[in-house]
Amino acid sequence: MIMDFLSEKFALKSQPSKNSDFYMGAGGSLEHVMETLDNESFYSKTSGSKCVQAFNPLQRAEHHVRLERTSPCQDTNVNYGITKVEGQPLHTELSRPMDNCNNLRMSPVKGPQEKGDLDELGDKCDSNVSSSKKRRHRTTFTSLQLEELEKVFQKTHYPDVYVREQLALRTELTEARVQVWFQNRRAKWRKRERYGQIQQAKSHFAATYDVSVLPRTDSYPQIQNNLWAGNAASGSVVTSCMLPRDTSSCMTPYSHSPRTDSGYTGFSNHQNQFSHMPLNNFFTDSLLSGATNGHAFETKPEFERRSSSIAVLRMKAKEHAANISWAM
């Protein structure tokens, strides 16, 4: 039944042969079609093209299996097969020599000789990788070499090639080593210059702002005492009125006579003097008296100085108000 269907579908060009394996082209999946067809060509009845697709059988020669595909439409034969030698693994045929330390076979190590070859190849790869990187060596200079180098550096920081070569001959160094030394020496010199400028700025700042302006813990009570002493020693009428409790020096004694304008003449005069006298005189007199007693008022900070003067003025105002109320 199958043969009848094939004979109707295809026209056989040659007689079929038995005992041959046929597989589809290499581009698709290997699929077993028929076992009884061998070396035949098929013509498609439905296809309008006259191109003939011929499939050669699998040929076996010298234990090789080759899969080929040919097309009668073209003159060239395209080989899509992979040669395989029976009795050997496939990866031994696929291995090819590769450069850059990749020439390693895929087969396992069979003996000590092959293992030694692999070790030698690995050592060679390591040596090639390490040699590609530049190794940096630290040069130890002697005292004579440093002396010669410093002499030239004092003259010029940027010696030319001729000077570097002459210096290299005298110091028994290479010109590259001399050049590197001058680069490092210039960097060190610039660093010292920056550090010196910073220190100079710090010293200038310390000289401008003296340390003596710092506050003293024992200066406030002494300054306050000096202020009171200065007020007592000054010859102003107002300070002499405020310091003592006795009001005889400030106003006339209170008389039980009827109130007259002449009874308050002394108090009114002193009050007029106090009203016309500026408050800055209190602070000025206290500063002068404090300076003459040996403690300069400039040693106090600005904030503490202001607070002390305000406190003194408030205390004086309270005493003056109390004296006025007692006199009334």
From Swiss-Prot:
Its main location: nucleus. One of its GO terms (biological process) is negative regulation of transcription by RNA polymerase II. Keywords: Activator, Developmental protein, DNA-binding, Homeobox, Nucleus, Repressor, Transcription, Transcription regulation. Residues 134-193 bind DNA. GO terms for molecular function: DNA-binding transcription activator activity, RNA polymerase II-specific; RNA polymerase II transcription regulatory region sequence-specific DNA binding. It comes from the Eukaryota. A motif (OAR) lies at residues 308-321. GO terms for cellular component: Golgi apparatus; nuclear body; transcription regulator complex. InterPro entries: HD, Homeobox_CS, Homeodomain-like_sf, OAR_dom, Paired_Homeobox_TFs. SMART domains: HOX. It holds the Pfam family OAR. Changing residue 112 to L: Associated with P haplotype. The keyword Iron-sulfur does not apply. Residues 194-328 are annotated as: Transactivation domain. It is found in: Nucleus. The OAR motif may negatively regulate DNA-binding and therefore transcriptional activity. It is found in the C-terminal transactivation domain that stimulates transcription. Belongs to the paired homeobox family. Sequence-specific DNA-binding transcription factor that binds palindromic sequences within promoters and may activate or repress the transcription of a subset of genes. Most probably regulates the expression of genes involved in the development of mesenchyme-derived craniofacial structures. May therefore play a role in beak development and regulate beak shape. Binds DNA as a homodimer; required for transcriptional activation. This is ALX homeobox protein 1. It comes from Geospiza fortis.
